[in-house]
Amino acid sequence: MIPHSSAGVQPWGHPLRAVHSASGLTDIPHALGQPDLHPEQSSMPAPQPQTGPSAVIDLTANGGEAQEREHPAKRLRLDIHSGSNARDGSPASAGLGEPKSTPVSTSSKPPPLSWRGRPVWSFQALLSEVPGAGEPNVESTTAAAQDVKPLSPPSFPAPPWKHSPADPTASSAAGLRGVTPAKEVRTTPYHIEVPSVAPVLRGDKVADFLPWTGNHPEDVLNEQTAKQGYYDRTQVSQNESNTARPSLYAQLKHRSGLQMLSSVFAAALEKRQGHSMVTAPSTFKPPPRVTLTDNKREAWLRDLANPTVPLRRLSRTIPHGIRGRVLLDQCLTKWVPVGRAVWLAKCVGANEIRAFKRKGTSGALAIGLEAKWVRDWTTNVQQFLDGVITSCGVADWKLKMTYAVSLTARLFFEQLLDHDQYLGWFLSSLEAAPLNTLPVWLLMLGIYWNHLLRYRKRGRRLAELLLEKLSKANKLDSSNTLRPLADRLSLHIRKLTLEHTSSAVLPHSWDKYKDLLSSCLNMKDSVHRAVIQNLSERNARVQRPRKCQETANQPPQQRVIQLFDSIRSTHDVTAVSIASLSAIDDKAALVFKLLEWVSTPFRHGICRVYTGARLLRKWKVAGVDVDSCIISFLAEGHDGSHLNMDNIYHIISELVRSQTFSVGRYLQWLMAKGVADCSKDSHQHHKHLSDDLELLLQLPVSRLPDHVRNLRNTLLHRAGIEVSKEEAMIATLKASIAQRLPNIFSSVTDSAMSCDVAQSELTWAVKSEIGQWIRRGVTEGRRGSTGKFQIAIGQPVLSADEFYSIRDILEGFGDLSMLADVLNQATNCDDGLILASAADTVNYHFQSFSVIGASTGLFRRFVESYARLKRLGVTSLDLILSLIDLGLHLPGEFNTVALLRQDLGRIENKSSMAAPSPLSDHIPATFNETDSLFPEKLDQLLFSGGGMDESTMDAIFNALITSLGRAEDRVKLSANDICRYLAYLRPFHPKHFDIMLIRWICGLLKSSTRTMLSRVLPPLIGVGCVTIQAFIFLVRRLLQSEKVASMIPHPNDLKIDLLQLLVPPPAGQSRYFDMVTYRFHLSQKEFLSKHPEETFNIIRDAIALIDSQDQDNHSDQGQMNLNQNAMVLLQILLTKNPESAVQYCTEKLITQHSTSMMVLTKALDTLLGFDTGPDPPNVSVAEKVIELTNDFSLPFCQLKLQTLFNAEAGSNVKNEIVDVMFKAAIADSRSRRSNWVGLVRLMNQDAVRQIRERAEKSFFAIPLFEEANEGRSMNNGTSLETAKLYLTIIEKLAYSIPDSGVQGVGSVLVEKMDLLLHKLVSMQTSYNGSTEMRHGIDAEQVIQSRTEFERSLAFWFSALLRMIVLHRSAFSIPPAPKSSASQEQTRLLISIFCITLARLPDSVLRLFPTADYFPHSMRQGDHRPCPGILLQTHALDVAASLIDMFPDELRHQCARFLKDKCSPFAQSQNDSRFLYLLGPLGDGPTSNATLPVSIPSPAASGSTPAPTPSGSLTAGPSNPPQPASASLGVPTGLPEGLNCGASHLCLQYRGRAIGAYPVRPWELLEDAAPIAGTNDTAVSLGYFDARRVRA
């Protein structure tokens, strides 16, 4: 029926919405803006032919005269059949039937309704369904345009029940009956009918339905209603307007007032409980299934796919055989609506589950069968979805994919799937999905996002999975085709990190993905930056170090040392100067560290001196008081530090030369100190002077003012040192040098005697004076009488011998700054040999000259000299080779090197392609090395510019080789000259020459006497015909071949020869070398620098031959110096690159023959400054090594301790060494040093393990809480500090913990954690019981005791958590699980949860600084009170890392234990973090069916029973077993997002709630039976005091 408009209510029909027009489009603007049409013409219009679909008839649209009446007259019910033509009685049809000739006046239409009337869109929208309403005539359109008024505001929201879905039956029936030509007319009188969709209240009453009858009080017209109108008057008493306090106060003052109030409240609670309890038994029965033919079954499925067919009719004939995968496929192929498909699945599932109960099975077995069926059904759903995804590319795949995803998601959220299995399968499928199908899975990921991240078990796996997929996408995305996919993955990872940060705590894979995860965040955003910092810290705290790691933040001293060492390779002094000043705030300590680095015996090379001098100059310019720092360094004294003080004095002399060091200030300090007042006979020689007084003797005086020089001489005289000896020494040296270089220096006085003086006796005052004198002599020798430089061919500035002598003197002094000036003068020479030698000198001291800043300038001067010689037609092959070798070290001179190589190539090509000279035709017959004109003929052949054939080359080569093999021929030609001729011979035919040379060398190796090889090989290497690397490779290839090795006499001697080939000349030996010999030593130095590992191998192979028994007499002479040579090479290699050299010695030499240990020990003893002797190592040696450990000697002390530990000694000695190391670790940790970590780092794993185990034993031996005594506070603080020391040692050596875990540590940690928990409970109880004593002195003692306890509790909890992280592998389940291991794991989790989530006084565990323990060092300037994460958060992260490796059963046991037996910590069950870590606990729908024994199980009965009140339960045990799902504290059984009262239902037993009411999702089924019962669902709607009645 359609109620009259004056009834005051909206009609009970479909909800008001925009109705689609015939064209399928919604004409909302037209419906809202179209005014009312013409009034009705007749109450009973004649039928007209049907021309369109049925429309809603607006019977409330009246004319103006009808609106003046108050109420319309009663009339019979207009029972217009839906099949009649609605247009007959509509104004629209009247307008169409009678065309008007005149436009309709706007005054004839009723005015638009105001907002107080019916909603504007109530019937206007429905009129859009009327044919022609969407196309109004011109007149009405024009009139509407002229009478446009503002639209009325929308009405209030309709009640919820008005949004019921449209009745498909009515619409379908209307469509079927629309073809009836005639209209059915019924004569029954009009009567009011209650709408079928109205809510029914108790007592057959209907809510919100009051039709107008004319008999209401407001319908009575009297004088009062005519004047004042009608309104409901609420009778309000006078008492209601006042406060209730007087009346209630009198009742409460009465003795029985509280009891009466309690009775009222109890009655109210009883009433509420009675109304809130469902007592009626469930009448639900699943709809039956019948056997149908295939045709009928197909017809039934088609009806199911038709939304107009009601489900209640289909529930009568559900066909058999539609189940599992077939059901889903049928729904997909028939396009069954998702809601109806879910209804079918529920019907089939309810019948399947009911079948288990019909067979007479027990309740437990029925539950198991039901769970198995749900798992199988979930598997079918998984296969169905997987099949649709794999069919990508077929027709309608997108629609099928959308349907399949919607259906499976609906089944998931309706709790019709096993959530744990389904989500696990989803993650596995997402992990295995290739990148081409990954977008589909990412779309589905948004559906299950919240469920996947609800628990730690799935959230961590999802985080790792997404990161791995993004990593693969980035690796394969070479052309940015996968950029959208990578962006989508990054978006998911960003959302997970920001919203579910705990799921990104990845103990095992954080190092792998941390950079990738950071790239997904916006590091410019402060929030993102804070999240990633917090996350990095949380992950770092739960990770166990896999390898040895020294302190996280490198000490500034070691950082500065690394900067100093880097200059050797970078040569960037300016950058190192700036970085060093910013690394250390104490500038005096910085200067001290630089001076130690320059003078330490554990670094190699004179380059350090010039590096230190340049840095000190730059620091003084930057404002550092360098003078005071140097004086303070010398005043400390370094007698026992084994420093090379000569390097210190060398630096100071360089500073004095550059006027950077203030000599006057030093002399003032020396006089103020009083050191110079010692007696004359107390110091007879300057070597006994102190360091600060020794500097007085070392100061250069050439550039000092006279008064300063006189003051110095005075102080020396007062110190007992004769200044005349220094002057005599200078004069003697000048006379000696002048005799060697008479063309440069004038003759000296006769009084000067020429003598040789040891270099160690020369002071830097003497060396500096001689160096400047030599430089001055070379410079003045270049000037003529006019004072200008003489540049003329044939008049060189220096001869070759003079240059070699000057270079020998200055290199012996170590005065490379003066040598650089001499080389600069040598560039003006026109002798290619001198220029080549000068370039080789720069190359030999390249690092020092680079630091001085002279290498690039000298190279360019040499290139200019070469260009000058080239213009003059002079070609020097030696100069070109030297310049190429030097230019390769200069990165900015590659273009010049390329030009030089072009010139070298032209020279070689010219020689090889030139036609043979006629002179060479008679060479083979007349050429002989015994000829007196042999050198002249060689010069004529080699430098004539003509060519040479191979036969001529063979003759010359054989003659030179024969001459090279004869020692007596050195009178004619030296070996160096012969090798130079060989180098000149090679360009004519390089390949042929190399073949002949290799054959000759192989012949020498196979000869019985190889003494000539050691004599001829260095010059061959010096001229470049042979390289050291090529010769070593040749020897190794020959020795590897057994056939060739058998032809070589004494093959082991070759290994010794290789060692001797690499040994440089002694430091004190004269370095007067010609160009060939100097180049050989240059090749030695480059080989040692570029091939240190190959050198170590040569040393190892040679040392192994010392004790071999098959040595013959030919190698006796080589074995005599073998140890010394090997030791010299080892010292050079160890000091050049300490870290890598020590690593190699540890891995290769120590494990070799005992002789290797002996030589290595001698080399180390020499460096460390002591000798252990032949006796076995003892503990005193280890203690001495530890005392010598500093920032420079650390690698060598490591190696020395390793040799001591691996020496052939008894186990007692090894244990004593471990004891010494353990004591050193404690001492260094107490003094906050980390040198002990470096000492232990290179020791074998057995020694490291012993040290760590001793620290663990000492740590566990410390009591957690000291007993109460007088010194308790002091003892407690001492015990905490001691435990902190041991914990630091354990943490530094954690890399020695095996992956399989350490036996016994897990049980000890469990006991310690249990003891900590028991102590917490007992102390908390005692504190709560002593509140009445807190006054006066007792109060202070209680507060102090409580503070100490809190501090100890926080420290020990954090310390034990760190130990658990380090020994996490000890808690893993063994291959054969034992009950004891499971119990320990459960106890550990329970203890961590109870302590973490306990509500302690002052929230002690929420403040991490209370622990006073920081596992990682704080940064300088970081004033935060804590590292950034709370101790409580860290504890939960540790628990999460344990849960990741524990089985699911342990999680369930832990949750049940906390619920049943840990009542003091019951609040933890409602903590979201607790649920996050221990879930999922009963995620599936079948896990909720476990009920108490006295309550009928839903699985055992025919249908789910409704819970009964406690009074109706049969007698049972006093403490019935609680359901598993209820004991976990996790809401289960209902869809987690279901917003209904059923989610709060619970079961009662004897008046006490015992668990959640298990609502069964398979029985939440609408239209399950043809006849609706009072309670046909699992939960009666009577719970809400209302139910929905359907026809």
Swiss-Prot record:
Keywords annotated in UniProt: Activator, Nucleus, Repressor, Transcription, Transcription regulation
Skewed-composition ranges (Polar residues): 40-53
Stored Pfam families: ARM_SRB8, Med12
Biased composition regions of type Low complexity, renumbered to the chain: 99-108, 1496-1512
Biased composition (Pro residues): 151-162
Region ranges (Disordered): 1-116, 132-176, 1488-1530
Intracellular or extracellular location(s): Nucleus
Quaternary assembly: Component of the srb8-11 complex, which itself associates with the Mediator complex.
Family statement drawn from the similarity comment of this UniProt entry: Belongs to the Mediator complex subunit 12 family.
Role description: Component of the srb8-11 complex. The srb8-11 complex is a regulatory module of the Mediator complex which is itself involved in regulation of basal and activated RNA polymerase II-dependent transcription. The srb8-11 complex may be involved in the transcriptional repression of a subset of genes regulated by Mediator. It may inhibit the association of the Mediator complex with RNA polymerase II to form the holoenzyme complex.
Protein name (record): Mediator of RNA polymerase II transcription subunit 12
Organism: Aspergillus clavatus (strain ATCC 1007 / CBS 513.65 / DSM 816 / NCTC 3887 / NRRL 1 / QM 1276 / 107)
Organism classification: Eukaryota, Fungi, Dikarya, Ascomycota, Pezizomycotina
Gene encoding the protein: srb8
